[in-house]
Amino acid sequence: MRLIRMLLLPALALTAVSAHADPASVASLKNLLDKSQTLTARFSQMTLDAGGTQLQETAGEMAVQRPGLFYWHTEGKAEQTIVSDGQKVTLWDPDLEQATINKLDPRLNQTPALLLSGDVSKINDSFDITSKQTSNVIEFTLKPKSKDTLFDTLSLSFGNGVINNMRLVDSVGQRTDILFSGVKANQPVPASKFKFDIPKGADVIQE
């Protein structure tokens, strides 16, 4: 679940450093992200080590809504649910019967999931962004303008204007690919999706 925490939960405080961005890529990514006020999808996630050996494979469903709302449910043996109501992030582990609650950090380099659900108007303050396009697919590579980040690069790929995958690579070459399917943009999402009612008797950890 390291990747889930990396994507959805606040990371360590980071120190900004200078970097260069491609203005056209920045504008294009902002435009694609801003087009979707809501997104729902299925996802499959695979984590590989630097040598290409599979470490973990999971699947589930997700939903996001601007500003700052997201729902991420991983199914199967590694079942977990992470929900943001725009103010706080709750991680629910049913096996442990434990809920961990964090304050939502609005900075994109602290909570990368906000690329899909947050304010991206200043995305180039957090990342150095480049892109490449082949046919109807455009891929963006984001490098954090920071030291000691949990990932070295974050890639977002869009096909026909809709996100189809994300990839994170960390400092030791471990790679996580997230493939989205059945993506629906700008469709109503029930408000209850972004509220998590902690089961009675569960352990609650405030961080």
UniProtKB/Swiss-Prot annotation:
Query: Is Signal among the key words of this record?
Result: yes
CDD domains the record matches: LolA
Similarity annotation:
Belongs to the LolA family.
What domain of life? Bacteria
Q: Which GO terms describe its cellular component?
A: outer membrane-bounded periplasmic space
Its keywords, alphabetically, are:
Chaperone, Periplasm, Protein transport, Signal, Transport
Where found in the cell?
Periplasm
**What does the protein in this record do?**
Participates in the translocation of lipoproteins from the inner membrane to the outer membrane. Only forms a complex with a lipoprotein if the residue after the N-terminal Cys is not an aspartate (The Asp acts as a targeting signal to indicate that the lipoprotein should stay in the inner membrane).
Q: How does it assemble?
A: Monomer.
Q: Which residues belong to the signal peptide in this entry? A: 1-21
InterPro entries, alphabetically?
LolA/LolB/LppX (IPR029046), OM_lipoprot_carrier_LolA-like (IPR004564), OM_lipoprot_carrier_LolA_Pbac (IPR018323)
The top of its lineage is:
Bacteria, Pseudomonadati, Pseudomonadota, Gammaproteobacteria, Pseudomonadales
Looking up NCBIfam families in the UniProt record yields: lolA (TIGR00547)
Protein's UniProt name: Outer-membrane lipoprotein carrier protein
* GO biological process: one example: lipoprotein transport
